[in-house]
A protein has these predicted regions:
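Noncatalytic, solvent-exposed loop/strand surfaces
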Residues: 1-265
């Protein structure tokens, strides 16, 4: 969330800028952010041909430890890799632009399991493909395919087997990642589609509330302006702040006591 609790951080950069320790030019195109866990840096990239997404591991002095091709990128507009890896208990979880959910062993980069979520769950996405990062919680990997079969699914983090599927909203997925929130001791998952914000029970997958009144004009809806939520909602003290792109505006919701309902503030 952009908040750091480390000691000794610089209050400002030196006038000549921070010292460059190392760099690499072998990642290919992509929008992934680096993740540093247990003295290693993990990031996703692309091969030179643009046909495979690649999971990279580096030591903190810049030595490449391994790379693993794990999935097929989105092949339409902007086919660059999207997902930032989620690291949990010695495993890395990534989602390809075509909707493959993949678990890798961080020790050697070998694929532990792989599920073609785009095909299995009949994914329905916008014109820029799948861009979410996996949420890992309670030994479950959360993914939002959208569409007419389901909206959000949970996979077993160890095996990739389906744990639950939520009901379908019949809407495109967005470009946000699932958000885990705790409201008055109740843990919920908040997700976003192209038309809705919704809350999910993490134990059962039941969608407990939806919010669709985004204030979009009929003209915008006629143009097909949906599925463009770019940022995961922000949560604080029972409130959710949701933003959208292309002049669609932003709004704030307030969860009720047990987080089974959300109303516009």
């Amino acid at each position: 969330d952009g908040v750091y609790f480390e000691n000794g951080l610089l209050k400002e950069w030196p006038s000549e800028g921070p010292e460059l320790l190392w760099e690499t030019m072998e990642l290919g195109k992509g929008y992934s952010s680096p993740v540093i866990v247990d003295g290693r840096l993990y990031i996703t990239g692309m091969d030179e041909e643009g046909t495979q997404e690649i999971f990279f591991a580096y030591s903190l002095d810049g030595k490449k430890l391994y790379q693993t091709a794990y999935g097929v990128p989105w092949t339409d507009t902007y086919p660059e890799t999207r997902t930032t890896p989620t690291i949990e208990n010695g495993k890395a979880y990534v989602i390809s632009g075509s909707g493959e959910i993949v678990c890798l062993d961080t020790a050697d980069g070998k694929i532990v399991w792989k599920v073609d979520g785009g095909k299995k769950f009949e994914r329905m996405t916008g014109k820029w493909g799948t861009s979410e990062c996996p949420l890992v919680f309670d030994n479950k990997v959360i993914y939002t395919p959208g569409g007419n079969q389901t909206t959000m699914v949970a996979l077993d983090a160890e095996t990739g087997e389906t744990v639950w599927k939520s009901e379908p909203l019949g809407e495109h997925s967005s470009y946000t990642s699932p958000l885990l929130v705790m409201n008055n001791g109740k843990i919920k998952i908040v997700g976003v589609t192209g038309k809705s914000v919704f809350g999910v029970n993490p134990e059962t997958g039941k969608i407990e509330w939806t919010f669709r009144d985004w204030g979009r004009s009929p003209e915008d809806m006629a143009k097909g302006f949906e599925s463009i939520a770019p940022n995961t909602p922000l949560y604080d003290n029972g409130r959710l702040f949701v933003c959208n792109g292309y002049n669609m505006g932003s709004f704030m919701l307030r969860l009720n006591v047990d987080a089974t309902k959300a109303d516009l503030v």
